[in-house]
Amino acid sequence: MIIERLVGNLRDLNPLDFNVDYVDLEWFETRKKIARFKTRQGKDIAIRLKDAPKLGLSQGDILFKEEKEIIAVNILDSEVIHIQAKSVAEVAKICYEIGNRHAALYYGESQFEFKTPFEKPTLALLEKLGVQNRVLSSKLDSKERLTVSMPHSEPNFKVSLASDFKVVMK
């Protein structure tokens, strides 16, 4: 089965009305536009999203819906650094330092709280800066992502040479 577009999200439906099968994804797999996965019930699916969300797939995104059958995204819990800033200045410092490392940064559950995937160097940096943090297991959902840039991403358009293209050597 090839999935080319999202159908919606489970938060907009009553999941109890449907037979929901899940594709379990790691947080870093949610930004893939082309991939193959197996659902919990063993169905093979291929994803080739034409209009992929800029932030990536989110918890509960519906990949397939037919009558009472749904295949939806489940983002697996992973080891995450929960960061609690004490001031606006500390928020700026956290965003600068995490961004400087090109690490993913997500909104937390409360004001001035952020999450980033666990990496020892990032944890050491936060300790050195005196920023309050704790390592917990939680979901990194794309809809809560602060950073949008996708290094090494493929363009969402086709490139072709114009009919009047010429190479001139001098």
From Swiss-Prot:
One of its GO terms (molecular function) is nickel cation binding. Keywords: Chaperone, Cytoplasm, Nickel. It is found in: Cytoplasm. The keyword Cytoplasm applies. It comes from the Bacteria. Pfam families: UreE_C (PF05194), UreE_N (PF02814). GO terms for cellular component: cytoplasm. GO terms for biological process: protein folding; protein-containing complex assembly; urea metabolic process. Gene3D superfamilies: Urease metallochaperone UreE, N-terminal domain, UreE, C-terminal domain. The keyword Hydrolase does not apply. Its main location: cytoplasm. InterPro entries: UreE (IPR012406), UreE_C_dom (IPR007864), UreE_N (IPR004029), UreE_N_sf (IPR036118). Belongs to the UreE family. Involved in urease metallocenter assembly. Binds nickel. Probably functions as a nickel donor during metallocenter assembly. This is Urease accessory protein UreE. It comes from Helicobacter pylori (strain P12).
